[in-house]
Amino acid sequence: MNQDDFRKLLATPKAETSQLKNFSSNKSQRLVFGRKHKTAKLEAPRALIKRKQLSHSTSSDITRHSNAKNSGKDTQFYEEPSSKQDIELHKLHEKLRNGQITTKEYSEKSKELGGDLNTTHLVRGLDRKLLEKVRSNELALDDSLLSSSEKEVDEEADKLLEKVAEESSHPESVSILEEKKKIPLYPNGQPKYRKILENGKKVKYLLDENGEILKRLVKKEKKLKNDNERLENEHRTEKLNVNANSLGKSFVKHDIPLPPVDLKLDIFEEVGEYDPFHENDKEPAELKAKDAFQLKGHHELDAPYHKKVFDTNQYSDLKPTNFMSQIHRLAKVQERKEEEERKKGKDGQIVDAGFGLVLSKDDTADIHELGESDDDDNVKRRKTKG
């Protein structure tokens, strides 16, 4: 079966209607015993009605396509135009396809199809001539409203732009206007300064409101110093001159001398002597009186040999005034240590035997050193005999 045969089948719906009639007649002839049969409505289902509509539409489309092929025209389907405007638009479209009209002519003529240009604002679209007149009037009004001062400002701005373009053409002077920070402007729109590179150096020009140069500022390059000592000194002076710069005064560093120190001065003169064992309380009153007498600078007539040595020596000022008292103390400390060692030795020899008995080491040694007595031997013999 070809496509043409299939289309013919779709175009002939008579077989379906005949089948429906036979189907409905068979249903009507049937009888049901015991009750009345309702008369069946002879209506086709919705699906069959839709099929009929589709078959009619496809058949009409097929005929149109076949006519287009036979005529040699494009196979594209066009609906029948409903008005004169649509017919003219269709003709314009065909002319544009054939290359008889350009796209501009096509757009202009399609706009004119709504009516004459004099009456389009009343019917459809806009009056383009009227718009052109209004725009021309607005431009004339803008020119008249502009004051003479504003015109001068615009002219100066144009001149500055020309200068910048000339400078950018030279490789030595490159403008640095394109920076992250925005350049401040005057109320009339003029920049307050301008930056330019000249011979590898940044140059800043301060400008007036009229764009005239007031000052020319050049940024100097700092020379690096290799000496570490100079850099350290500069760092110190910067720290010292922070307060001086804020007050507007020059600060000078002065070397302040330290006060003189008396090396002979005894800083522990009023504190007294260190006495951990509190021996001064037990000393006799005579020794204390002698120490006090020596502190005052007096010496006994029958002084010992070591005192005479200090008196005759050239370093007599450094002699200890309480030399004897120190010797007595050291002797007492030594005696106490010896007594404590003796007590510890005695404590080690004593043994607690229990029941309040305390035995010395000598007694316990005798007990352990003794061997078995004769009585013990006799007892063992008796046991063996018995």
UniProtKB/Swiss-Prot annotation:
Q: What is its main location?
A: nucleus
Q: Which GO terms describe its biological process?
A: meiotic cell cycle
Q: Metal-binding: is it a keyword of this entry?
A: no
Any one GO CC term of this protein is: nucleus
From what superkingdom does this record's organism come?
Eukaryota
**Subcellular localization:** Nucleus
Give start-end positions of Polar residues composition bias: 15-28
Q: Where is this region: Disordered?
A: 1-28, 46-85, 366-386
Q: Which InterPro entries match?
A: Red-like (IPR039896), RED_N (IPR012916)
Keywords attached to this Swiss-Prot or TrEMBL record, sorted alphabetically, are: Cell cycle, Meiosis, Nucleus
Described by its record, this protein's role is as follows:
Required for meiotic chromosome segregation.
Question: What name does this protein carry?
Answer: Meiotic chromosome segregation protein C1539.02
Which organism's genome codes for this protein? Answer: Schizosaccharomyces pombe (strain 972 / ATCC 24843)
